[in-house]
């Protein structure tokens, strides 16, 4: 409405309903989404700053969520990319060596190279590093988490295995199929087998290097083997209890502000919610009242 009044003042009587419709269409298609995105970014940075003040750390957030960049609600799918690793490495370089780093992760995974770069940079930082997982950090996200001095997860959050994927297939499954079928396979399959062997060996060694200082040689080798050898499917949820069973130390005290930050990454506007609830915390008295 404000836009229509503004345009009417500018254009005067010469403005037709078609002109108004055109300007409104341009506004909704390009200008409004950009304005909302800038507003959300400002709120995110403010929330990050509050977490930094509370914890005395440099906070870096890598949150991959579907976001709609137009009023049509077209979702943009996100995962760990080289651009992410460039930005995180830059943020770490801008952080004093004696300042702790909190890396907040919410991701399905992504490129192995980018994840490895982030993991190495995190491990090499001299002050304490913490990875905070409010919901999930699968695949490459799990690899990054293993590099931190401390992992903080929501009690219902999950990580995942870091076994290599060759194209659309797990490297461990390619090897399993080869061992069952024997030598009577195509040249292409033999090439995939060779790549799979190398990929598993490389990832196992990489995870071991991340863990050995924290857990010691024997335990680090055991955890690395378990996470990279295809023990589970790639999307298998490693819960807090499962991680502790593997010997990985996990803290479940996620700062409340981290959840508030995650809420500033809304799902696409065009998507109809399938979950409904009253979005306020209930007190114990309210619980007792409802029970009656």
UniProtKB/Swiss-Prot annotation:
The keyword Nuclease does not apply. One of its GO terms (cellular component) is membrane. Keywords: Membrane, Transmembrane, Transmembrane helix. Coiled coil: none annotated. Its main location: membrane. Disulfide bonds: none annotated. It is a single-pass membrane protein. The keyword Ribosomal protein does not apply. InterPro entries: ClpP/crotonase-like_dom_sf, Pept_S49_ser-pept_pro. It is found in: Membrane. The chain crosses the membrane at residues 17-37. To M.jannaschii MJ0137. This is Uncharacterized protein MJ1495. It comes from Methanocaldococcus jannaschii (strain ATCC 43067 / DSM 2661 / JAL-1 / JCM 10045 / NBRC 100440).
């Amino acid at each position: 409405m404000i836009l229509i009044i503004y345009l009417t003042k500018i254009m005067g009587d010469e403005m037709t309903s078609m002109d108004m419709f055109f300007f409104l269409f341009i506004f909704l298609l390009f200008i409004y989404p950009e304005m909302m995105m800038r507003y959300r970014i400002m709120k995110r940075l403010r929330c990050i700053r509050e977490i930094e003040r509370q914890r005395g750390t440099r906070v870096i957030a890598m949150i991959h969520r579907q976001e709609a960049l137009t009023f049509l609600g077209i979702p943009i799918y996100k995962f760990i990319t080289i651009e992410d690793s460039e930005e995180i490495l830059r943020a770490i370089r801008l952080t004093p060596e004696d300042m702790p780093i909190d890396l907040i992760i919410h991701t399905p995974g992504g490129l192995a190279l980018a994840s490895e770069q982030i993991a190495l940079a995190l491990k090499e930082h001299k002050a304490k590093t913490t990875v905070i997982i409010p919901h999930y950090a699968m695949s490459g996200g799990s690899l990054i988490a293993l590099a931190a001095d401390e992992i903080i997860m929501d009690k219902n959050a999950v990580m995942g295995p870091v076994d290599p994927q060759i194209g659309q297939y797990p490297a461990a499954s390619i090897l399993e199929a080869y061992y069952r079928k024997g030598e009577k396979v195509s040249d292409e399959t033999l090439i995939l087998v060779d790549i799979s062997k190398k990929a598993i060996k490389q990832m196992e060694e990489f995870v071991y290097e991340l863990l050995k200082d924290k857990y010691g040689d024997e335990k680090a080798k055991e955890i690395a083997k378990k996470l990279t050898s295809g023990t589970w499917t790639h999307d298998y949820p490693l819960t807090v209890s499962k991680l502790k069973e593997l010997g990985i130390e996990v803290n479940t005290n996620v700062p409340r502000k981290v959840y508030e930050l995650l809420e500033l990454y809304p799902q696409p506007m065009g998507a109809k919610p399938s979950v409904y609830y009253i979005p306020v915390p209930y007190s114990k008295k309210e619980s007792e009242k409802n029970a009656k």
